[in-house]
């Protein structure tokens, strides 16, 4: 028995040491001592008044004013008072966040400069969103601008990336004191079951894949005014230059949703051709199939779109909801969807010459050998392809109004 215990003793000692290592907090950092960063905005370089005043007092270092980063930190004082939980929204309450802007030519060095202005360590593992202005996206390749984010092992690749019209830092401001703008921006994307003009989230992880593939892609755009923010349209990023080449408005962004068949909900509004009255179709399901066709050297596509949904608004109350009337309404909605799809196809195929709707993926899967020949100049091939489309809408429910 003693010899058995003797043999097991070294193993028991090792287990005990491992347990101490696992349960210990030797490298832990108190959350109160950390500057939790929830959002970063990237704008073209323009020193803030605070930076200029600090510079006059000697607080500067050698740099070019290429970009301005705005860090959004949680306001520890407000959090201690309970405002970050949604309370304290009165006039005298503190905002739940603090924004600090710094200008320079290196994201890493800008972060170091921010640390000279904060009494807490800049802590990025909780970074939720990066917002880039259109000016930045037009000027700098996005892979170069986000290189530091990709390399920083503190930053999670689930972080959302957005574009912004105007200054990106404006998207990190809210009128309400009790809410943190970063969480508002994330929350807007979660309304995709209600709105078909919201794109699937573009995270840092997805962005890496897009950049490596060389494909053109979209970034959800956000606009800001007077402390209010809204998802509105998308930025078109060219796969070769990695720069922004244009925008899609909300209507055109909805067209991308129909082509891809990615919508989880939304509303199509139109007008009955006969009565000219407003009607609204609530989307329950969208299904889309992009079919590539190759004949000799010619490449074409047909997009087959199907949808089911409910008639949720009908201002024409004089006509009975009979089969003939319903068929007419379905045709009206189908024509509206065709209009939406046609407009965005013209924009991406002929104006921007950028496939941001997934035609490349369909072609690659259907013709893998041909894909190897055309993938390097796919956007050019896409811009010359004939594209047809069909739409079939089925109204399945009519609300609580009974059919006459």
From Swiss-Prot:
Membrane topology qualifier: Lipid-anchor
Coiled-coil intervals, chain numbering: none
Covalent lipidation (S-diacylglycerol cysteine), chain numbering: 25
Lipidation residue positions, type N-palmitoyl cysteine: 25
Keywords assigned: Cell membrane, Germination, Lipoprotein, Membrane, Palmitate, Signal
Role summary: May be involved in spore germination.
Official protein name in the record: Spore germination protein YndF
Organism annotation: Bacillus subtilis (strain 168)
Gene: yndF
């Amino acid at each position: 028995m003693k010899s058995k215990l003797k043999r097991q003793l070294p193993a028991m000692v090792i287990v005990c040491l491992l347990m101490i290592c696992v349960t210990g907090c030797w490298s832990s950092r108190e959350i109160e001592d950390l500057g939790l960063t929830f959002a970063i905005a990237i704008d073209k370089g323009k020193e803030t008044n605070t930076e200029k005043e600090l510079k006059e007092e000697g607080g500067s270092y050698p740099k070019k004013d290429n970009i301005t980063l705005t860090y959004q930190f949680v306001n520890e004082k407000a959090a201690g008072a309970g405002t970050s939980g949604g309370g304290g929204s009165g006039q005298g309450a503190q905002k739940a966040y603090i924004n600090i802007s710094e200008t320079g030519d290196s994201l890493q060095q800008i972060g170091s400069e921010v640390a000279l202005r904060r009494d807490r360590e800049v802590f990025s593992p909780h970074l939720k969103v990066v917002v880039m202005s259109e000016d930045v996206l037009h000027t700098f390749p996005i892979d170069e601008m986000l290189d530091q984010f990709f390399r920083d092992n503190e930053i999670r690749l689930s972080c959302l990336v957005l574009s912004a019209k105007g200054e990106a830092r404006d998207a990190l401001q809210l009128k309400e004191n009790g809410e943190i703008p970063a969480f508002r921006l994330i929350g807007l994307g979660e309304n995709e079951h209600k709105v078909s003009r919201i794109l699937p989230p573009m995270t840092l992880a997805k962005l890496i894949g897009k950049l490596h593939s060389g494909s053109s892609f979209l970034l959800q755009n956000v606009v800001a005014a007077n402390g209010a923010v809204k998802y509105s349209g998308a930025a078109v990023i060219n796969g070769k230059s990695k720069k922004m080449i244009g925008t899609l408005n909300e209507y055109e962004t909805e067209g991308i949703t129909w082509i891809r068949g990615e919508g989880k909900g939304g509303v199509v509004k139109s007008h009955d051709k006969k009565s000219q009255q407003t009607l609204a179709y609530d989307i329950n399901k969208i299904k889309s199939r992009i079919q590539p066709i190759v004949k000799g050297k010619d490449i074409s596509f047909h997009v087959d779109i199907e949808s089911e949904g409910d008639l949720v608004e009908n201002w024409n109350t004089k006509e009975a909801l009979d089969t003939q009337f319903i068929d007419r309404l379905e045709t009206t909605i189908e024509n509206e969807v065709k209009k939406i799809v046609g407009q965005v196809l013209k924009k991406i195929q002929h104006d921007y010459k950028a496939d941001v709707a997934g035609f490349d993926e369909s072609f690659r899967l259907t013709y893998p050998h041909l894909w190897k020949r055309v993938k390097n100049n796919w956007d050019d091939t896409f811009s010359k392809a004939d594209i047809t489309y069909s739409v079939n809408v089925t109204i399945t429910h009519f609300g609580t109004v009974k059919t006459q």
